[in-house]
Each structure stands twice: as C-alpha cells, then as structure tokens.
C-alpha cells in the first residue's frame, strides 16, 4: 500500500512539475513575441506629449476628388483642433493617420455605407458635446497633427504583459510547491 502511494505521489509531482515548466515556457515565448512586436512599436511612438485640444471644426467626408471628378468613398470624419497653441488635424490613432491622411476617424465596418455614415455622425456628435478633450502630440516642432488615442501607449503595453506575467508567476509557484512538497516528504520519511 505504501509503495503504491509513493508511486502515485511521484506521478502527480511529475505532472505538476511538467505543468509548471510548460507554463514558464509559454510565458517566456510570449515575452519574446511581445518583445519583438509590441515593444518596438511602443519605443518608436513619438506621440508622447499629452495636450489639451479644443475643437475647431468637424466635417464628414464621403467623396474624394480624383482628377477633377468626385468619386464616392467610405464616409469618414475630418476634425480640426487647436492643440499646443496651434492648429492641428486630429487623428483617431496612429493607424488612422497611416491609412488615410484625409480622414480623422474611419469607421470600423465599411461594408454598409449607411451604418458607416451613422457611426461617423455619432462620433461627430460626441466631439461636439465635448469641445475640450485630451489628445497626444509629438515634440516635433513642424508636426501639424495630433492623436486622440495612442495604440501603443503604456496601458496597452501593461495590458499585453499581464497574462504572460500571470502565467510565469503561476508556473513558478507550481514548481516551488512541488519542490517544497518533495523536500517535506523526504524530511517526514527520515523521521
């Protein structure tokens, strides 16, 4: 009976140890992936200065002029603000600025034109409700654009590091508990 109990205990310890090591390895892999993808974007972000923006005007643009002809396009919002003592164009995020510099806000779903237009009008109404809000600007002197929201800010970095840290801590705790259990069982067997 005693030998079966010891064998079962060893199998359970081995499984728990494997679980702990697997959790630690997953955390290390996740840290590596985040370190090569998210961290460089955070470090390269120039939108670090938080400023107070005042709304100047908003326009809904749904046509683009190409070669003198107006071509239908998805609806988007154009927002002009006063920030850091000068006129600037407000962009929703870094990606909005990269996708289309003629739009401050691009709706998420562009499949249905009417739904996209309703989304843009809702965002426009929110801007008109709050005339003064916080935005992010760069320290570059000649930059005439600001961001409403940073994609790669400190909150995003901390949120993405939460689960790997939780996994690493849990794995290390499991490994520590197995090692403590082994040493206590050896001490108990010696007495």
UniProtKB/Swiss-Prot annotation:
Q: Name one GO molecular function term.
A: potassium channel regulator activity
Cleaved signal peptide residues: none
Task: Enumerate the Gene Ontology biological process terms.
Answer: detection of calcium ion
The family this protein is said to belong to: Belongs to the KCNMB (TC 8.A.14.1) family. KCNMB1 subfamily.
Q: Which GO terms describe its cellular component?
A: voltage-gated potassium channel complex
Q: Which ranges of this chain reside in the Extracellular compartment per its record?
A: 37-157
InterPro entries with a match to the protein in the record: K_chnl_Ca-activ_BK_bsu
Quaternary form?
Answer: Interacts with KCNMA1 tetramer. There are probably 4 molecules of KCMNB1 per KCNMA1 tetramer.
- Main location group: membrane
Membrane disposition? Multi-pass membrane protein
What keywords appear on the UniProt entry? Glycoprotein, Ion channel, Ion transport, Membrane, Transmembrane, Transmembrane helix, Transport
What this chain does, per the record?
Answer: Regulatory subunit of the calcium activated potassium KCNMA1 (maxiK) channel. Modulates the calcium sensitivity and gating kinetics of KCNMA1, thereby contributing to KCNMA1 channel diversity. Increases the apparent Ca(2+)/voltage sensitivity of the KCNMA1 channel. It also modifies KCNMA1 channel kinetics and alters its pharmacological properties. It slows down the activation and the deactivation kinetics of the channel. Acts as a negative regulator of smooth muscle contraction by enhancing the calcium sensitivity to KCNMA1.
Name its species.
Oryctolagus cuniculus
* PTM comment, free text: N-glycosylated.
Glycosylation sites (chain numbering) = 80, 142
Which of the residues are on side Cytoplasmic?
1-15, 179-191
Disulfide links within the chain: none
**Under what name is this protein listed?**
Calcium-activated potassium channel subunit beta-1
Question: Can you say where in the cell this protein is located?
Answer: Membrane
Q: Its domain of life?
A: Eukaryota
Which parts pass through the membrane?
A: 16-36, 158-178
């Amino acid at each position: 009976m005693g030998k079966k109990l010891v064998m079962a205990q060893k199998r359970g310890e081995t499984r728990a140890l494997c679980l702990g090591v697997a959790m630690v390895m997953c955390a290390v892999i996740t840290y590596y992936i985040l370190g090569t993808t998210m961290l460089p974007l955070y470090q390269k972000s120039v939108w670090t200065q938080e400023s107070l923006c005042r709304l100047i005007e908003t326009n809904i643009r749904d046509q683009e002029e190409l070669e003198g002809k107006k071509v239908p396009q998805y609806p988007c919002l154009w927002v002009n603000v006063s920030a850091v003592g000068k006129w600037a164009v407000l962009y929703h995020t870094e990606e909005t600025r990269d996708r289309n510099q003629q739009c401050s806000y691009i709706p998420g779903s562009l499949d249905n034109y009417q739904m996209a237009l309703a989304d843009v009008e809702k965002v426009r109404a929110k801007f008109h409700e709050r005339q003064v809000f916080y935005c992010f600007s760069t320290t570059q002197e000649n930059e005439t654009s600001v961001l409403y929201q940073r994609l790669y800010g400190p909150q995003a970095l901390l949120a993405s590091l939460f689960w790997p840290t939780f996994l690493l801590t849990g794995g290390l705790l499991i490994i520590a508990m197995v090692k403590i259990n082994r040493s206590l069982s050896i001490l108990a067997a010696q007495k």
